[in-house]
Amino acid sequence: MARNDLQGSLDLLVLKTLSQMEELHGYGIVLHIQRASDELLSVEEGSLYPALHRMEMSGWIRSEWKVTDTSRKAKYYRLTPAGQKELQSAEKSFEQLVKGIRAILRYA
């Protein structure tokens, strides 16, 4: 269970970002996570795009090709109602994981 929670951290970060920003392209998601974490977290694009594809296949996000402000085509991602439910579940699971880690750190 904890291993899945740790591996699901990227999903949680992406879903939370899309819940706050409505829609973003992949690089925008990377930048938002970096800025929102005060540069403590960074997401490699090589990890992000497979995760976005998997989340889209799961129905948690949907995508649409659009033209950016710099006149380039980019795939923009948006949270779905199923993604909102998954976000709520992932937040609860993550809080439980953090609670467990805190308990161990206090014990040690």
Q: Which functions belong to the PLM regions below?
A:
Residues N4-S47:
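N-terminal helix-turn-helix DNA-binding core of bacterial DNA-binding proteins
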Residues L48-M55:
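Basic amphipathic alpha-helical segments that dock to polyanions
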Residues L79-G83:
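Accessory beta->alpha helical hairpin/"wing" motif in late/C-terminal subdomains of nucleic-acid enzymes
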Residues E56-K73, R78:
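Beta-hairpin "wing" of winged helix-turn-helix
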